[in-house]
């Protein structure tokens, strides 16, 4: 077991931090490379994350040659050989996003079999919208023994309305529809920047996708797609996490290559709290205030406030001088991190999907456990300002979405370290709290 140990109290982050390629963009784009029947695809700006390694293994076991050059942050994929139809259970069960291989496999093979996905324990997150989309394109769906199968002799374009703008469903249906005969119109689609990035690579590959980033997408089916070179868009959630870190520590941090247009709701909320946000030529600078003001947040599908920034916002709200209200509308069961923050003397109440955070308490370091990916980052952020030592465990979640998070914080001046069991025992024997 590993832990991140945070020595908090008077941390002020200063300097420059580099943002990686987006986890939420690279995973569906890796799946999209299965559609390339000609050539070798090269993906650049690929983040070194455990989820990326998992997706690489899912793809490899479909009879695809894949190589990850970690030094160059590049992945090459040769999917020109006949593909398998079944995604490997060992890897699919670890990560929910692996369900997005289903659309490309259905489009390419006319047959896809995928185990029910795993991942972070954030609510139910059903995949019924994915399956309804496949059915609308002419696929037969079979659910049996923990597996889902989609079978179609031919996919036919159709008009599909999503009851909710699900990111995963939008991606899966897009990738199936690019090979469907005729025109597919998808209404009430997800509009996240990662959707636009997926559409960009699909169009480079020879697809005809119109309207990505808007509420309605139109896709004209094509017969074949080919390999391309593509650079993954920057990670707006990692950028947002460091923006919050700077703001809550009275810091002064330049987040390199962060795209302000992708973080408008967060910028608005941090400004309300007193932070100064400056757009510079090579990124976004965040200067934290001496006194943080409270602010209310309601998560929404893009372009609303992102649910993936909710935990980090609760971290900064703990130190605001007043009461903040958070309303989570995207996922249920996404306040588990708040129970861990209570261990640090946080004053809060949870009522269904609403959390009331009374800021201004003196928070104390404690041993806490990450309950999901963003919770892991949020607990570390609270530790930066809490008095004493905070120990954050269950780092498998952190590694799914952040590359060397502790090292980036160290570079900005934080007193944090990542230690293994042996070093933990040594420190516990010598440290008085």
UniProtKB/Swiss-Prot annotation:
InterPro entries cross-referenced by the UniProt entry: Enolpyruvate_Tfrase_dom, Enolpyruvate_Tfrase_sf, MurA_subfamily, RNA3'P_cycl/enolpyr_Trfase_a/b, UDP_GlcNAc_COvinyl_MurA
CC terms in the record's Gene Ontology section: cytoplasm
2-(S-cysteinyl)pyruvic acid O-phosphothioketal: residues carrying this PTM: 120
Keyword terms: Cell cycle, Cell division, Cell shape, Cell wall biogenesis/degradation, Cytoplasm, Peptidoglycan synthesis, Pyruvate, Transferase
Binding site for UDP-N-acetyl-alpha-D-glucosamine: 96, 125-129, 308, 330
A family per Pfam: EPSP_synthase
Membrane spanning residue stretches: none
SUPFAM superfamilies on file: EPT/RTPC-like
HAMAP family membership: MurA
Function: Cell wall formation. Adds enolpyruvyl to UDP-N-acetylglucosamine.
Annotated protein name in UniProt: UDP-N-acetylglucosamine 1-carboxyvinyltransferase 2
